[in-house]
């Protein structure tokens, strides 16, 4: 028996556009000598004493196992021939605005998720084109023809499936998921690839024996709600390709943060501050990607006994600079009373966007 009725609106035409290795692709475009070489956007660990985090990298670097959010030190160990570029984020933002203008030729119902990806609702569009697939192809063509960059596109009847579709074939892919194909498309998929299902939820699902979309289909709705609360309702529908969330052109993000749970508890100040430095870099990357600056830095600490402490500090000027975020996080930590307890989680968030 269903707790909530299944309502599946299959009339919409949603496109998800995701630029391919965006920052790195812009650098290769602007410097053809980089073509064919592994390019890593992030500080060179040979110049920073091993500090820093990879913002993104091109597909040549990914062949060596390099990926975003990896430490620059590990990226260098995996790919010593990689070319490290600190990045020109003002340039990336300018190109992102050019891409946004291309989207606007087709629809005003655009929900940017970051500087390099967005949802578009083209059910009703400016050119009166009935085929969302045709519009997706036109957008890909425009981006390549005008900016010499590639984008992957996913087309479906909701945002959840469009996002999954755009990730399915990269780079420069175009994947379509029709209503009658949704369950079959999702069935063999690793549950960790379901958009919106985080690591903690994946762990819980694995404990339940759920590893794929097909496994999730077998779980009763009430069981999922008992285990996950309201999110169980969403999981039950995701497995069936149901998601009626609208494309919100006025979507407002109020904060950006990163956190990490540690299998081995942190005790030493050196280890704790090292982790805060890495988190600051990741937060900066995310702020740049979303073109945000904030005035308030929030430090979150969860101790071994699962008690949680949250403390914040406001700045005079909004920032997205990793050094400012790192310095403020260290200041907040230093202001705390000495705690002999081990730390199992650290989090850094920037809010108070200008």
From Swiss-Prot:
Keyword DNA-binding: yes
Species in which this protein is naturally found: Streptococcus gordonii (strain Challis / ATCC 35105 / BCRC 15272 / CH1 / DL1 / V288)
Cofactor(s) this protein cannot do without: Mg(2+)
Family assignment from sequence similarity: Belongs to the DNA polymerase type-Y family.
Residues annotated as domain UmuC: 14-198
Annotated Mg(2+) binding sites: 18, 116
GO molecular function: damaged DNA binding; DNA-directed DNA polymerase activity; magnesium ion binding
Substrate discrimination, annotated site positions: 23
Protein name: DNA polymerase IV
SUPFAM superfamilies cross-referenced by the UniProt entry: DNA/RNA polymerases, Lesion bypass DNA polymerase (Y-family), little finger domain
Keywords, alphabetical: Cytoplasm, DNA damage, DNA repair, DNA replication, DNA-binding, DNA-directed DNA polymerase, Magnesium, Metal-binding, Mutator protein, Nucleotidyltransferase, Transferase
Annotated cofactor note: Binds 2 magnesium ions per subunit.
Quaternary structure (record): Monomer.
Record function comment: Poorly processive, error-prone DNA polymerase involved in untargeted mutagenesis. Copies undamaged DNA at stalled replication forks, which arise in vivo from mismatched or misaligned primer ends. These misaligned primers can be extended by PolIV. Exhibits no 3'-5' exonuclease (proofreading) activity. May be involved in translesional synthesis, in conjunction with the beta clamp from PolIII.
GO cellular component, one term: cytosol
